[in-house]
C-alpha cells in the first residue's frame, strides 16, 4: 500500500462556523481533517503533517517556498510515495503553480481544498481529500507534475484557475480542460500535461506588483512602483496590449532595469504578437518586456 503524506495548510476545508460571528474560522486540525474521511485507510497508508492553519489569502510567497522545500526534503526519504496538500481555494492555484515550477521531486503531489466549511451542510472537503489521496497514490500520477483535484476532476497545476466565488464546481482549465478523473474504482488520465521548464533557486522575490490595464488608463499606478516593487506583471487588454500612457510608464521602468511580464486580463487565450502598433504585445516585446504567453496573471507573479 502506498504511503501518502497529507500536508495541511488551512483554508475553508479546515474551517467551521464561529458561533459569535456566524462566519467561517480556522478550527479543524490536520489530523481531524483526515479522520473525517471515511474509508481513507482502504486506499493508502496516510500520515498527516500540519504546515499551517490559516486562510489561503494569508499565504505568502515565502510560505509557498518553505512548503516546496519541505516536500522535496521529505520526498528524498522513504516517508512518502506521494503528497496531498490541503489548501484554501482563494489562492490554491497560485501555490499549485508555484510548486509545479520549483519542485524537484517526480513523486505525485496533489493539491485539494473545499468550497464549504467542515461544519456546513454537504461539506465537500472529505470527498476531495479522498479523491486527492487516491490520485497521489495512483501509479498513473507519477511524472504528471503537480495536480489539482476537486470534485473528482484532476487538473494540471500550470493551467487551472478558480472561476466562481462560491460554487463548489469552481476550478477549470480554460485552455484544455481536465487531464483526468477519479472514478469509483480507479484514477484515469485522458491526457499528459505539457512539461514546462523548472526553476531551481535558493531565493525568491516577494515584492512583485500586479497591475491591470483598462481603457484610458494613465501611467500613475505604474510610476508608483518605482522604488517599491522589484518587478511588475502588467495585466494587458486583449491579446496583451497596453494603453498609450500606461505604455510610457512601463517602458520607463523597464529602462530603469525592472523586470516586467506582460499577461492579459482575458480569462482564456494567450498573449500574442498580433499587432504592431505602439503598446501592442509585439512592440512591448521589442522594448524588452517579457511576454507571459498562456500564464494567468497570478501565475506570472508566482514565477518570481
Q: Where are the model-predicted features located?
A:
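Accessory alpha-helical/coil subdomains and C-terminal extensions
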Residues: 7-8, 29, 36-37, 156-239
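A glycine- and small-aliphatic-rich helix-loop capping segment at beta-alpha/alpha-beta transitions
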Residues: 20-28, 91, 97-109, 125-131, ...
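Short Gly/Thr/Asp-enriched flexible loops that form oxyanion-binding sites at enzyme active sites
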Residues: 85-106, 242-250
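ATP/NTP phosphate-donor binding region
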Residues: 1-73, 248, 268
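Internal gly/pro-rich beta-alpha loop/helix module
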Residues: 111-182
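Catalytic cores of soluble, metal-dependent hydrolases
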Residues: 215-294
Amino acid at each position: 500500500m502506498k504511503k501518502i503524506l497529507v500536508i495541511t495548510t488551512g483554508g475553508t476545508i479546515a474551517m467551521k462556523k464561529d458561533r459569535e460571528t456566524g462566519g467561517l474560522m480556522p478550527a479543524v486540525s490536520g489530523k481531524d481533517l483526515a479522520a473525517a474521511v471515511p474509508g481513507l485507510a482502504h486506499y493508502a497508508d496516510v500520515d498527516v503533517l500540519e504546515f499551517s492553519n490559516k486562510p489561503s489569502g494569508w499565504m505568502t510567497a515565502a510560505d509557498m517556498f518553505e512548503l516546496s522545500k519541505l516536500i522535496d526534503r521529505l520526498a528524498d526519504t522513504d516517508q512518502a510515495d506521494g503528497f496531498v496538500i490541503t489548501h484554501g481555494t482563494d489562492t490554491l492555484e497560485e501555490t499549485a503553480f508555484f510548486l509545479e515550477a520549483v519542485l524537484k521531486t517526480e513523486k505525485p503531489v496533489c493539491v485539494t481544498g473545499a468550497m464549504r466549511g467542515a461544519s456546513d451542510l454537504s461539506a465537500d472537503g472529505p470527498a476531495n481529500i479522498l479523491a486527492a489521496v487516491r490520485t497521489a497514490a495512483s501509479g498513473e500520477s507519477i511524472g504528471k507534475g503537480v495536480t489539482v483535484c476537486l470534485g473528482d476532476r484532476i487538473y494540471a497545476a500550470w493551467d487551472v484557475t478558480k472561476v466562481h466565488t462560491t460554487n463548489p464546481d469552481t476550478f477549470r482549465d480554460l485552455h484544455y480542460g481536465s487531464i483526468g478523473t477519479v472514478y469509483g474504482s480507479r484514477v484515469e488520465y485522458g491526457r499528459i500535461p505539457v512539461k514546462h521548464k523548472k526553476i531551481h533557486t535558493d531565493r525568491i522575490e516577494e515584492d512583485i506588483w500586479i497591475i491591470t490595464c483598462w481603457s484610458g488608463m494613465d501611467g500613475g499606478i505604474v510610476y508608483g512602483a518605482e522604488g517599491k516593487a522589484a518587478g511588475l506583471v502588467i495585466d494587458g487588454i486583449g491579446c496583451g496590449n497596453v494603453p498609450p500612457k500606461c505604455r510610457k510608464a512601463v517602458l520607463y521602468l523597464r529602462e530603469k532595469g525592472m523586470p516586467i511580464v506582460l499577461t492579459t486580463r482575458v480569462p482564456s487565450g494567450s498573449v500574442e504578437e498580433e499587432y504592431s502598433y505602439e503598446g501592442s504585445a509585439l512592440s512591448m516585446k521589442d522594448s524588452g518586456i517579457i511576454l507571459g504567453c498562456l500564464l494567468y496573471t497570478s501565475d506570472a507573479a508566482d514565477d518570481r
